[in-house]
Amino acid sequence: MRRQVRSKKAAALKALEDGDKVLVVDDFHYIDKGIQIQIVRSLKQLIFDGLRVVFLAVPHRAYDAVRVEREMTARVTQISIPYWSQDELRLIAEKGASALNVEIAGNDIHEFAEEAFGSPHLMQRFCHSLCINNEVRETLEKKRILSTDDKERFFGSIAVDTAKSAFERLAKGPRARSDRIQREFRTGETGDIYYGVLKAIAASGPKTTLSYEEIRQRFKEILIGDVPQAHEITRVIQKMSGIAKEDLQGEPVLDWDEEESRLHLVDPFFAYYLKWGELVPRESADG
């Protein structure tokens, strides 16, 4: 069987060598590190000989190919696809308003762009909700001005449909052998360390990239009493990253970079929920 696998691998590499094609490896960042090493090392000589390979990955994992094989350092060029800029996001609202013959009042467009976390989909959600709330469903004959009177209520109502289930699953954590310690927060509620970590992340803004030190500092600011030990916080972040990859549908909402000790909020909808959603503590899995 091993010989058969080896022969298939050799045949695949031979086909790549002989054909004038570009090899594309999608979602490279999701592949287990050990498999990443095998892939890169198998392709390394062909790449040195001129084979063109594209590894598609989220921005903070763009150099995984170099991390697993240092000899690739001078052979990798990153082509970045950034989040949408504020100007690009505002254009969505401006063009939509023009098409519907409406005007968006005051500073609303600017605020929409700021709250979208670089996501055109969130920007479209804001515009859609604005129209529905003002009963605009088609192009108007007479121009109207649309506004959001209560910003907290407006953004909060949208948060319910973004990433509530992801938050609840991460706050629940893995199955525990015993009840987790409940901690008291300055906002009045109590919750375990999983809820605390999410609340600490939210307290950062949330920022979409946080170092371990930033998360721990935010924990100190929101908690009454002693902060959990460093290894406890790190363990929880690692567990959350695993849950995000294995238990949640679709793309993981967050990702912990072990080497850099940085947490990345990959999903703009999740970041948005942490800012505007109702962060309710949950009981641990067994208690």
Language model region names:
Residues 3-60, 67-70:
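Conserved Walker B catalytic segment
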Residues 32-35, 85-89, 229-232:
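Phosphate/oxyanion-binding active-site loops and adjacent basic polyanion-contact surfaces
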Residues 81-109, 117, 121, 125-128:
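Conserved small helical "lid"/interfacial subdomain of P-loop NTPases
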Residues 106-169:
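Amphipathic alpha-helical "lid/sensor" segments that cap RecA-like P-loop NTPase cores
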Residues 146-287:
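C-terminal leucine-rich, beta-strand-based interaction scaffolds used for sensing/assembly
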